[in-house]
Amino acid sequence: MALRFPRFSQGLAQDPTTRRIWFGIATAHDFESHDDITEERLYQNIFASHFGQLAIIFLWTSGNLFHVAWQGNFEAWVQDPLHVRPIAHAIWDPHFGQPAVEAFSRGGALGPVNIAYSGVYQWWYTIGLRTNEDLYTGALFLLFLSAISLIAGWLHLQPKWKPSVSWFKNAESRLNHHLSGLFGVSSLAWTGHLVHVAIPGSRGEYVRWNNFLDVLPHPQGLGPLFTGQWNLYAQNPDSSSHLFGTSQGSGTAILTLLGGFHPQTQSLWLTDIAHHHLAIAFIFLVAGHMYRTNFGIGHSIKDLLEAHIPPGGRLGRGHKGLYDTINNSLHFQLGLALASLGVITSLVAQHMYSLPAYAFIAQDFTTQAALYTHHQYIAGFIMTGAFAHGAIFFIRDYNPEQNEDNVLARMLDHKEAIISHLSWASLFLGFHTLGLYVHNDVMLAFGTPEKQILIEPIFAQWIQSAHGKTSYGFDVLLSSTDGPAFNAGRSIWLPGWLSAVNENSNSLFLTIGPGDFLVHHAIALGLHTTTLILVKGALDARGSKLMPDKKDFGYSFPCDGPGRGGTCDISAWDAFYLAVFWMLNTIGWVTFYWHWNHITLWQGNVSQFNESSTYLMGWLRDYLWLNSSQLINGYNPFGMNSLSVWAWMFLFGHLVWATGFMFLISWRGYWQELIETLAWAHERTPLANLIRWRDKPVALSIVQARLVGLAHFSVGYIFTYAAFLIASTSGKFG
């Protein structure tokens, strides 16, 4: 009996129903709730699992390199990046007929292949890889790192190598290690790779281990570094006629501030990128020496926080008590980490297209669309997770005595003001934005499109002008040709910036108008509503006027029985659950906007977006319907084409999405009755009744069914849009 699943909970292992299985899976990673868990074992388990996570990541990236080297066309792509389609891997499928074999044999391949829309070809090319042998070497190295990570994870579970709790809670040492050791040293190492391998590679010089020590990255070597003449490293940059990967038009500079884009590759100058990483390395190497550890110098974080008491008294006891609150709560730390990572991931989505760093990636439109959408969705899930763990912190780890009248306690004390302000902002944005859209729809429907309310985003245009965009005629700061900022910019810093901002061939500072104004506020509505639900969930997690003892019920509970009416759907988990729908909704609007705007930009008919994006029917007809036409014809009675797999995935995504509603709309009692009927039929059916079960079948709990519904809704939603995005973009641009 003791060996039944789950072994981490004897109470659950003895449950006679199928609840044992589902609750076991649901709580498998909730280490805090396991039998016999101690704080020390909790920290050690999480620490060891990090190495397993790293091993999986290294194995996965190794697989990418290996499959491209084995089945891809990297060497052919390198010869002509703009016209050869990069191959991710081969496809073998016994169901393929001759039309499918022909449709999927692309990129110069002999048989069916998948085209890579991940941008890895451009990345590998930019950082200096040129041959399949390079890819195999990288795959082997990452495989080696994966094995090392697994060994390290196993090692740190052995008694002799298990770190103590005090080691885990040594915040200063950890910060120093992460800032200097991880960010600082890795940025410096990456600068080294760019300067020694990637930049020579972009100039037609093949640097590998055999000649690494013989090839000077700069004609003057380390001389300028030691003599303080650092500006010599910026002299003689690549010319505007430079052909990437060759010596034609190349220079000798290694660290520059050119600004703008390489004219041929449409990506940032590699020498600018190296300079950026060197600066980052310097900042983090210094930052990693700020905190007091072994030598008695530097800051103590606890002292810093204890001293943060604003003299005006408006923030009470300021940051007193926060050090121990944060340092003793893994949920608080995870919440902070997820919030930071979520913001960074969204910034990555934004910057990968507006300031492309990889050679020729800006001209690979499908890859640009896929990467933007991918990173925005990931950012959404990570950010909602941050609030989820913030709420769990308030329920499990928050100590009111320890935080009396500090900034954290004061957040809880005036939560009504915070929540009601967010509610007011959401209502204002929602009614006004929808009102404008609907008004415009009515005007078009009644044949008077000239009566639409079209608002120019003059403040945003002014900001773009201040950064150098001249087309609006604002004549301010960098767009003012006789101003000091403009003149300094032409020589001292980023001379290429102004020409890049005013080029219409890139995505830097797109020209904006009334359609952008409206969708911007629609997105603002989504962001504020998502935030409202998440913030309310966290701030009400310990209790509310309706349910003051809420924290005693834990993070996820359906209701407090029939005796307390109105306690359903108010757990912190329910807030997270509702917020994910709004998050998906918001990112849908963000990606629709980005994609439609860019399709018209790439096709050279931006006026279609400008004219149709000011009313809802325009979005439905001229974006969704118009761009799904190729998808809907991916296969039909007359045959199929290379979009057929996306057409099928589009259909399948809708199916998964719709399945979600089955769990979201019908609740536990319906399923319980159905299960009991099915069990009755099973037990009375010959042959079938030879199969018995130990656990009595019961329906999922309300919370679990909601999770299953949410998972189907999310996965189906994203699958559907991914298929639409890739097919509609690749169908137009190849």
Curated annotation (Swiss-Prot):
Cofactor note: P700 is a chlorophyll a/chlorophyll a' dimer, A0 is one or more chlorophyll a, A1 is one or both phylloquinones and FX is a shared 4Fe-4S iron-sulfur center.
GO terms under biological process: photosynthesis
Enzyme nomenclature, EC number: 1.97.1.12
Location(s), subcellular: Plastid, Chloroplast thylakoid membrane
A GO cellular component annotation in the UniProt record: photosystem I
Disulfide bridge partners, by residue number: none
Entry binding sites for [4Fe-4S] cluster: 559, 568
Binding site for chlorophyll a B3: 662, 670
Membrane topology: Multi-pass membrane protein
Predominant localisation class: plastid
Enzyme class: oxidoreductase
Positions of transmembrane segments: 46-69, 135-158, 175-199, 273-291, 330-353, 369-395, 417-439, 517-535, 575-596, 643-665, 707-727
Annotated keywords: 4Fe-4S, Chlorophyll, Chloroplast, Chromophore, Electron transport, Iron, Iron-sulfur, Magnesium, Membrane, Metal-binding, Oxidoreductase, Photosynthesis, Photosystem I, Plastid, Thylakoid, Transmembrane, Transmembrane helix, Transport
Residues bound to chlorophyll a B1: 654
Catalytic reactions on record: reduced [plastocyanin] + hnu + oxidized [2Fe-2S]-[ferredoxin] = oxidized [plastocyanin] + reduced [2Fe-2S]-[ferredoxin]
Assembly: The PsaA/B heterodimer binds the P700 chlorophyll special pair and subsequent electron acceptors. PSI consists of a core antenna complex that captures photons, and an electron transfer chain that converts photonic excitation into a charge separation. The eukaryotic PSI reaction center is composed of at least 11 subunits.
Family: Belongs to the PsaA/PsaB family.
HAMAP family recorded: PSI_PsaB
PANTHER family, per database record: OUTER MEMBRANE PROTEIN, OMPA-RELATED, PHOTOSYSTEM I P700 CHLOROPHYLL A APOPROTEIN A1-RELATED
Primary role: PsaA and PsaB bind P700, the primary electron donor of photosystem I (PSI), as well as the electron acceptors A0, A1 and FX. PSI is a plastocyanin-ferredoxin oxidoreductase, converting photonic excitation into a charge separation, which transfers an electron from the donor P700 chlorophyll pair to the spectroscopically characterized acceptors A0, A1, FX, FA and FB in turn. Oxidized P700 is reduced on the lumenal side of the thylakoid membrane by plastocyanin.
Protein name as it appears in the record: Photosystem I P700 chlorophyll a apoprotein A2
Origin species: Citrus sinensis (Sweet orange)
Lineage: Eukaryota, Viridiplantae, Streptophyta, Embryophyta, Tracheophyta
